[in-house]
Structure formats: C-alpha cells, structure tokens
Amino acid sequence: MARPSLPCAVVAVLLLALLPTPSTAGDPDLLQDICVADLTSAVKVNGFACKAAVTEDDFYFKGLAAAGNTNNTYGSVVTGANVEKLPGLNTLGVSMSRIDYAPGGLNPPHTHPRATEMVFVLQGTLDVGFITTANKLYTKTISAGDVFVFPRGLLHFQKNNGDTPAAVISAFNSQLPGTQSLAMTLFAASPEVPDGVLTKAFQVGTKEVEKIKSRLAPKKR
C-alpha cells in the first residue's frame, strides 16, 4: 500500500497557525524571530530558554513519515512533533503529532489542557468524540480526508472500529499541548489517589479500584 501523502495535513496546521490568537488562548506571543529551545538549560521559564547555537536541524523532524508500533494494550500509538522533539517550535505556538491505530485500536479518553486539537485522517475510518462540561457527547465517524476538531481541555477519544489500520495527523495551537489520560490520571498517579476518593466517586468497592490500579500500574522491567 502506498504511503498516504501529507499535503492536506500541512495545509491544516498552517491554517491553524494563521488564525487570530486571543490573549487568553494558546501559547504567549513570541518576542523575536526565533527562540530555539535549549532543552538542557537549567533556567525555568514558561517554555524553554533560547539556545545560542542554532542550525537548520533545529527546525526539522522526520518522525511522522512512518507508522508507529501499535502492538500495545490500547492498539494505538502517538508520535509527537512538539518542542521536545523539534526545538525550533519554541515560542511559535504550534505542534503536530501522528496517531496510528491497529484494527479495533483506541486512543483512550484524554484531554490536552493547553491546546485545541485538529485531526486530519490519513487512512482508515474512526469513531471520534468529545464531551462538554455539560456532559454532552458530540461524536462523528470520520474517514480519509476528513477533519475533526477537539476543543481545548475537553475530554475526547478516537476509536478504530474498522478491520484495517488507521492513521491521523493532529495539529495543536501549542508547542507542548500536554496530555492527561483519564484512566491513568485517576488510577496510576504517583503517589496514588486514595482508594476512598475513587470508591466514592465511581460508586464501586475497594476491590474494584485495586483491580483497575493493578492493571494500569507501570510494568516492572
């Protein structure tokens, strides 16, 4: 199978980057042409300090070209192209990622606290959705060439219900959008969320909570 082309995804992220940015949304405005992230700097700022020696490679990343390995519990994998992988994104307020899904694969419910996400489907068919603060679910089945938007901070998911692999390119209006998985946040936090909080919140017993925690606990090597 020929590898899907990316032009439409590139157009999508460029359009997102060109949208007017209110002072309350996305990352802060840049104050110079470039500020390539110094990922080794001990200076703590809202973002990353600028490094002095800059090269073309600071603005280049080829990690989205190939499909990721979906051989895991959820049958999906996210390959990020954020400031940690592409230092030239520092202060520019955009990033991307590629998400690959095995047949039946799920990108489980999660949020991006610092960014709105827009996905462009490269191949396959996905059931996607997000939930508002009023507990209203908006869901849609999307296929190759389609675009869907997940508003900033809202819980959302993607599920491949097809019998062939699927893939999307995601665009974000943040250099580092952050990801908070609902299940991992509640049941695999360190230190642990007290059982009493979870049993009362989910109206289940301690045994059920401990069972979920054991399944989500990091695997020992």
Swiss-Prot record:
Localization, UniProt: Secreted, Extracellular space, Apoplast
Disulfide bonds: 35-50
SUPFAM superfamilies per UniProt: RmlC-like cupins (SSF51182)
Protein family: Belongs to the germin family.
Main location: secreted
Pfam family, one: Cupin_1
GO molecular-function terms, A-Z: manganese ion binding
Protein function: May play a role in plant defense. Probably has no oxalate oxidase activity even if the active site is conserved.
Subunit structure: Oligomer (believed to be a pentamer but probably hexamer).
Organism, as annotated: Oryza sativa subsp. japonica
Protein name listed in UniProt: Germin-like protein 5-1
